[in-house]
């Protein structure tokens, strides 16, 4: 199924690209989320007429994401207290929700879906580097200091 992308989609393309995707992916994900429209003649003409407006909107979203990333980077360190054993091993773990709540409490609004933990949840005390994917192109990093209660 041919679609026109209205937003940058990972591993697919960017604004204005005409790509061929499976019908289910287009029908169930891209179109309902507003990331694409079917590539009909009417939609192609409509898109070309609104291209500048859509590019400006995309640039505005990117600028807002960069501003949020700067705020997150400015935090540098966030401390989370959790129960731990003698050897620094936590009872339980610290996941994306706990990190998002701690960063939000520090003053920057972050959704748990933006937290990236490449090595899985945090299970030990100490400092861990956590990255945030604020936008498909914008990343931020914070050091999470896990201390024992």
From Swiss-Prot:
SUPFAM superfamilies reported in the protein's UniProt record: L9 N-domain-like, Ribosomal protein L9 C-domain
- Please give the biological process terms from Gene Ontology that the record holds: cytoplasmic translation
Which PROSITE patterns does the entry mention?
RIBOSOMAL_L9 (PS00651)
InterPro entries from the xrefs?
Ribosomal_bL9, Ribosomal_bL9/RNase_H1_N, Ribosomal_bL9_bac/chp, Ribosomal_bL9_C, Ribosomal_bL9_C_sf, Ribosomal_bL9_N, Ribosomal_bL9_N_sf
UniProt KW keywords = Acetylation, Ribonucleoprotein, Ribosomal protein, RNA-binding, rRNA-binding
Q: What GO MF annotations does this protein's record show?
A: large ribosomal subunit rRNA binding; structural constituent of ribosome
Q: Which domain of life does the UniProt lineage start with?
A: Bacteria
Q: Where are the N6-acetyllysine modifications?
A: 89
Recorded GO CC terms: cytoplasm; cytosol; cytosolic large ribosomal subunit
Q: Which residues carry this modification: N6-succinyllysine?
A: 71, 83, 112
Repressor: present as a keyword of the record?
no
Keyword field contains Acetylation = yes
NCBIfam families xref list: L9 (TIGR00158)
Indicate the quaternary assembly: Part of the 50S ribosomal subunit. In stalled/collided disomes (pairs of ribosomes where the leading ribosome is stalled and a second ribosome has collided with it) bL9 in the collided ribosome contacts bS6 and uL2, while it contacts only helices of the 16S rRNA in the stalled ribosome; the inter-ribosome bridge thus formed is different from that formed between normally translating ribosomes.
Q: What does this protein do?
A: One of the primary rRNA binding proteins, it binds very close to the 3' end of the 23S rRNA.
- Similarity-based family: Belongs to the bacterial ribosomal protein bL9 family.
Q: What is this protein called?
A: Large ribosomal subunit protein bL9
Gene that specifies this protein: rplI
